[in-house]
């Protein structure tokens, strides 16, 4: 039998601080990922061909816009609508379900990016691996469509699992003679089972990401040993490409593990222990991780860095023109 601890009330100051931090995280995450999306989308508008990596980054940034929006809605629900002494309301459960699906799509896209780096950077010697790398490079658009299809399938299965257990809850209520406490526990456990189901579907892309990232790491080590033997030039383009790719992949791995741990810990905090402060901390960590990886992607991509430099130069020149105009106005006065 499940035993629930006492419900921790949250002061107005804590809720206000959490909401302020959530607004900042949403603003930073939205701006960074919208920047990546707009830079790549502008190339599409100008009818310039997008590289495979740019296509993946475009899809990845769009999926993270949804992630940040859902996490911000979750923060609003926690601070204003959801009382942990009551069962989770329907709107909050829908937000959590959509977040699980968007997070899984994000993982599939990261696995696709890792495979793309492998196909471009690793020099394979086996015929099968050479053909596989060539196939990945040629079929990247189909892989992206496949990711969307897998996300849709996962959505249907998660919704089926969730509402199927909801039917079990309704049937249970009829036979429990209005035992509301047990009904609340079963309703909350429905979300937990759906959460576990989504995480099981995340195992294949996560393993794919780990294998391809491991192959890229081995390739980097082999390339560095070759450089020590045959050349003294430390500025090798292939080496720099390896390092930049690994930085983006390792940073994603770290941020994803941290975010997943926070999400997993938040479930018992939300359902069993009703610790709203703990849930707020977990939501804050989950919102910060995609923003951090977006910053790493911008710093490691030459086109995005050039766009940032252009924007900063434009802002600097605009401020200078405005300051000169104000100085001229004062002189005339």
UniProtKB/Swiss-Prot annotation:
The keyword Cell division does not apply. Residues 39-55, 116-142, 212-251, 298-333 are cytoplasmic. One of its GO terms (molecular function) is bitter taste receptor activity. It is found in: Membrane. Its main location: membrane. One of its GO terms (cellular component) is plasma membrane. It is a multi-pass membrane protein. It comes from the Eukaryota. InterPro entries: TAS2R, TAS2R38. The chain crosses the membrane at residues 18-38, 56-76, 95-115, 143-163, 191-211, 252-272, 277-297. Most taste cells may be activated by a limited number of bitter compounds; individual taste cells can discriminate among bitter stimuli. Belongs to the G-protein coupled receptor T2R family. This is Taste receptor type 2 member 38. It comes from Papio hamadryas. The lineage of its organism: Eukaryota, Metazoa, Chordata, Craniata, Vertebrata.
